[in-house]
Amino acid sequence: MKSTCYMIGILLLILQNTYQSPVPEADGSSRSVKAARNEAVDDSEQLKEVKRHSQGTFTSDYSKYLDSRRAQDFVQWLMNTKRSGGLSRRNADYERHAEGTFTSDVTQHLDEKAAKEFIDWLINGGPTKEIISRRNAEIERHAEGTYTNDVTEYLEEKATKAFIEWLIKGKPKKIRYSRHAEGTFTNDMTNYLEEKAAKEFVGWLINGRPKRKDLLEEH
């Protein structure tokens, strides 16, 4: 009887050990299942990121973030500028430009400066009566055409005088005769007279126009 009970106890222990041994395997399997689920979640998150990049939603979210950041910075800048009073001054300048008052003020300043300089010039002497009368006379002569006539007469007289001197001090007769026949003498004379007249006319303009009386005395 005792042996039978002993055998039954051993069988019960064996059965108990048999049922208890799969428990760690179940725990390990549950952990592996959780790990697999976590990996699946990570993979799904990565797939979502890839899809967002491919669909442009990631870039859109990044742009929204940058826009919101710029908006915050701009609001902060406005608050700081308003405190310092710089914004009101800038708005005033912009309004003046838009209304044209800024340009008008600049024009008015330049006009006042020009008027002041002109008054100072008049006070410090200005044009003398002799200069004014001489200018008026020159204007009248230009209008009547006498100024151009005097210039033409002066050039003709100087050219004639220079041509006579050139003939007196010119080349030998034989050379002049042959050149007359070829026509080169006339061309050279024309060129010389034109150059001489132009040179003397420039000098006449620089040194002042001689009077007609002086020209007559020279001849």
UniProtKB/Swiss-Prot annotation:
Residues 1-20 form the signal peptide. Keywords: Cleavage on pair of basic residues, Hormone, Secreted, Signal. Gene3D superfamilies: 6.10.250.590. The keyword Secreted applies. GO terms for molecular function: glucagon receptor binding; hormone activity. GO terms for biological process: adenylate cyclase-modulating G protein-coupled receptor signaling pathway; negative regulation of apoptotic process; positive regulation of insulin secretion involved in cellular response to glucose stimulus; protein kinase A signaling. Coiled coil: none annotated. GO terms for cellular component: extracellular space. Its main location: secreted. InterPro entries: Glucagon (IPR015550), Glucagon_GIP_secretin_VIP (IPR000532). It is found in: Secreted. The keyword Ribosomal protein does not apply. Residues 23-43 are annotated as: Disordered. Residues 21-50, 84-95, 136-140, 175-178, 213-219 form a propeptide. It comes from the Eukaryota. PANTHER family: GLUCAGON, PRO-GLUCAGON. Promotes hydrolysis of glycogen and lipids, and raises the blood sugar level. Belongs to the glucagon family. This is Glucagon-2. It comes from Xenopus laevis.
